[in-house]
Amino acid sequence: MPTEARDNNRHIHLGKVRDPHHQHAQRFCSNRISTCKYNGFSFLPRFLYEQFRRYNNIFFLAIALLQQIPDVSPTGRYTTAVPFLIILSVSALKEIFEDVKRRRSDNKVNAFSVEILVDGHWIEKQWKDVSVGDFIRIDNDSLFPADLLLLASSEQQGMAYIETSNLDGETNLKIKQALDITSTMTSPEKLSQFESEITCEPPSRHVNEFNGNIEINGVARHFGIDQLLLRGARLKNTAWIFGAVIYTGHDSKLLMNSKRAPLKSGTIDVQTNYRIIFLFFVLVALALISATGSEIWRGNNIPQAWYLSFLEHDPKGSFLWGVLTFFILYNNLIPISLQVTLEVVRFFQAIYINNDIEMYDVNSDSCAIARTSNLNEELGQVKFIMSDKTGTLTRNVMKFKRLSIGSRNYGNNEDDEFADASLIEDYRQGDEHSTSILEVLKMMAVCHTVVPENKDGQLIYQSSSPDEAALVRGAASQSVSFHTRQPQKVICNVFGEDETIEILDVIDFTSDRKRMSVIVRDGAGGDIKLYTKGADTVIFERLEHGKEQEEAVEYCTEHLEDYASFGYRTLCFSMRHLTEQEYSQWAPEYKKAILAIDNRAKLLADAAEKLERNMILVGATAIEDKLQEWVPETIQALMAADIRVWMLTGDKRETAINIAHSCALCHTNTELLIVDKTTYEETYQKLEQFVARAIELEKQEKGFAMVIDGKSLLHALTGEARKHFGDLALRCHAVVCCRMSPMQKAEVVEMVRKLAKHVVLAIGDGANDVAMIQAANVGVGISGEEGLQAASASDYAIPRFHFLRRLLLVHGAWNHDRSVKVILYSFYKNICLYIIELWFAMFSAWSGQTIFERWTIGMFNVIFTAWPPVVLGLFDHPVPAEQIMKYPALYASFQNRAFSIGNFSLWIGLAIVHSLSLFFLTYATMEHQVVWDNGLTGGWLMLGNCAYTFVVATVCFKALLECDSWTWPVVVACIGSIGLWIVFVIVYSLVFPHIGGIGADMAGMAAIMMSSYTFWLALLFIPLATLLWDLVIKSLFTIAMPTPRELAVMYNKRTTSFNGFERLASYSSNVLENMRLLTSSLRGSTTGSTRSRTASEASLALAEQTRYGFAFSQDESSAVAQTELIRNVDSTREKPTGR
């Protein structure tokens, strides 16, 4: 059982009888994970904290408390408290519902199964039951549930292939190797007899650092990162491994690089807070003005009117008392229902997202999931997208596609795999290139570190490099099949006959060399050959001189241009025949370099240089790193929508640049500004230089992108360099950040958020993306693949990257436009009604008397005008989905209609004008209170109820006026709300006064109002007269600043009416400019294949690749060197079962 940590290090006993209920088992972190925002203890304080970050909630709490002061409130004691409690309850239920969804997602991960050794037998348990010190078995293609110490594996020498793309984004597999003293424990019986003590460093977030000792029989052995298997990584090409659990749950390196789910609030919420602060000061000013008016009126009238003398010494007539009274009277200028209306609207908007059949993926049987609804509007304001590469943009599937040999360019781009029968035909017919065909296929089958495995009669290739595996499979498809590896030789089936090829030496691949070589003896006593594969830049300069090779390079270059235009990963193959004497002279020098301690790297490089020269070019290959479906088209559409896309990946620079081109993030004429320095001073100077270059390119209107690696980023994010980095990054059309740690991704996201002050969206599929997903304004996880960490930590989950286009362009644009209307409309209708109290105060001696019945004041928001903003937020379609998907430029025009101060001021101004119109027209209509044929009058409440009715009608018609598409729910809600008020007046005035005296003032009011023809005429005339202002303004805005919907409609009709529109636009240069921009953008955003590029563009692409290397994926920091791997593997040995 594990013991407690006796010092800063962690001490773990292995192999003793384990009692899961023992107290020591509780000293380490549980393996249960949680991404929930709340728990049973934190819900109330955290929920209240989140709610009272909204200033309107603080305001209404204060009003509810003030109303409890006796006689200070003209509207009653509970007219604010009751609605406020209802609103908080609705918000709490919504938060609980969404957090339950997160908990279910966590439980899905916690319930993954794993085999744990118990009493010498493998017992299947859940991930959450894994404890420190457990022995566990992981089978091929399974995820590691915790950080493990590798003890043994099914492979020779205790080796295991690990896929870490979920952690660092790298496509190549890592090779881990168990210590020799534990690698022999290949059965549960041996493992159950094993006993030792582990001492290792405490949990840390450094994924590339780990040290510890394991003590067996009194002898301590050191282990390190080469023996550590991280949670979230996946076992590949290895039947099984045994591991000892070192770190669990939130102590694991993966989760230490993640953050607790943050409390995110949208930009609109922040802006709404500022608007509420503004209205609060307006409210205070009105209260002070009204209290001052009261003081003036009292001073002028009380001394002259003997019947008012009792008010002279009344404490309730003080200025402060008046301020409080008017403050409460006008408090509804700030809409109490705004938050609950938004909560309801956002909740159902999230349901729309969840049920959008257009975002359903058949292959993974998964759909889009809105894990929070608070950020729906943020989807419509995105300016930056930070995307992971591996698994998000790419499938991490390599396909051998093309082959260049001499003047022949074999293969095509349409087939999924290499398919060209003419290759074999040319070889069999003795074509002039037949020798090269045979040699390049043999090189593809021999020059690598792949290990073959015969499983059920089928060859399976295990490789740390997916590129190498793709080449070996490609050779096998062309009848040169590699099937056996032994320490000193490989056996290949070459066109039906087995050939044994002796491996004499291996010169390892490194990123500096950009090549790998093997020296082979072709058959018993055959020729010695040097096979070298690598980047075109390093291969071409090592070829022998002569016209023949110059022609070969010319043909190869032409083919490489073709491959570059499709974003393929290219590799050149060359060879050289060696004499026995040449090899025997060189081999001792190379072996001496291998054994050297000092200057080993230089000695190895010098030895390689002596041999890798005067070679002949055999051919070149093209490998496709397959993108996810519709990735180039999606990125094109997003960029057409004025969104900047960044790629943040842990993969190599060359691979990242290659994918940036193939997914249309960078084009072939995009100038790459590469920052790859190792010191702060160099990084600072390079950034400063590139800022000047960027300014120059902007003037020339040329495209440019920045590429920066993780080491340079460490310096770029510190000190004065941070300013230059931010300046350069925000100027670039695209940015590629490679070799990044999870926390660096998060730091970049946070930097862009602060500097750009725009909405940043982060999207990824792996556990290494969790930190940046949580750091972004909006986090999107890919849910279609196994490993749910990213999806669980995200705000929105989608099955595939290309669904991001619909999520932003359709749901984002719609939700943003709808929510802005909901907020503005809520402010508008409240000011429209409650500012009437100010106008009435002028005619009521500034007494603080309300013109409306007290309970109808509270019910205005929660009942009579509750539905129009809801249907506006759910059913309004500002632009049809088909149009905005076809013309992404419309998305940017929605952002131009943001929640601006100007737009807010317009709505507030109209609300004040409407309230003036409604009050004074109503007052004028009933000025002498003679509204019946018999001369009876109705009193002040009659005036208030009539004005109330006209306000309800006006704000409902206003909702119809602001709606871009009249659907039946919108019409029913608006007309129905007017009818609801009429019905309420009838019921309230006839029934409630007889139930405990509720609403006694309203007794008989329905009969009084509805028996007057003046009321019915005014109900028809006054709202229409009031809304004439809006009709005039909307007409002017349609001409001067048309909406995105209007622009799209005009664009669709351009063939018949565009000339007429041009003439109309002559009255407004603003419209003309908008139309030109939109038209050019729409024409430029039609999605087509990004791979239709000109020859000159392809040439530029090749030039870039020759400057920056190639995209060959090979792990050069493996626990097992390539030479050692080749020398230690014997694929003919039988593997242990581990059972």
Swiss-Prot record:
GO biological process: endocytosis; lysosome organization; negative regulation of phagocytosis, engulfment; phospholipid translocation; phospholipid transport; positive regulation of phagocytosis, engulfment
Highest taxon of the lineage: Eukaryota
Keywords: ATP-binding, Cell membrane, Endosome, Magnesium, Membrane, Metal-binding, Nucleotide-binding, Translocase, Transmembrane, Transmembrane helix
TM regions (residue ranges): 78-98, 276-296, 318-338, 831-851, 855-875, 901-921, 935-955, 972-992, 1013-1033
SUPFAM superfamilies given in the database record: Calcium ATPase, transduction domain A, Calcium ATPase, transmembrane domain M, HAD-like, Metal cation-transporting ATPase, ATP-binding domain N
Alphabetical list of Pfam families matching this protein: Cation_ATPase (PF13246), PhoLip_ATPase_C (PF16212), PhoLip_ATPase_N (PF16209)
Chemical reaction(s) catalysed: ATP + H2O + phospholipidSide 1 = ADP + phosphate + phospholipidSide 2; a 1,2-diacyl-sn-glycero-3-phospho-L-serine(out) + ATP + H2O = a 1,2-diacyl-sn-glycero-3-phospho-L-serine(in) + ADP + phosphate + H(+)
Residues annotated as catalytic: D388 (4-aspartylphosphate intermediate)
Disruption of the gene: reported phenotype: Results in abnormal formation of intestinal vacuoles.
GO MF annotation: an example: ATP hydrolysis activity
GO cellular component: apical plasma membrane; basolateral plasma membrane; cytoplasm; early endosome; early endosome membrane; Golgi apparatus; late endosome; plasma membrane
Catalytic class of the enzyme: translocase
EC number(s) given by UniProt: 7.6.2.1
Major subcellular location class: membrane
Similarity comment: family membership: Belongs to the cation transport ATPase (P-type) (TC 3.A.3) family. Type IV subfamily.
Described purpose of this protein according to its UniProt entry: Transports phosphatidylserine from the outer to the inner leaflet of the plasma membrane, thereby maintaining the enrichment of this phospholipid in the inner leaflet. Ectopic exposure of phosphatidylserine on the cell surface may result in removal of living cells by neighboring phagocytes. Regulation of the phosphatidylserine distribution in plasma membranes is likely to help in the maintenance and control of the membrane surface charge.
Record protein name field: Phospholipid-transporting ATPase tat-1
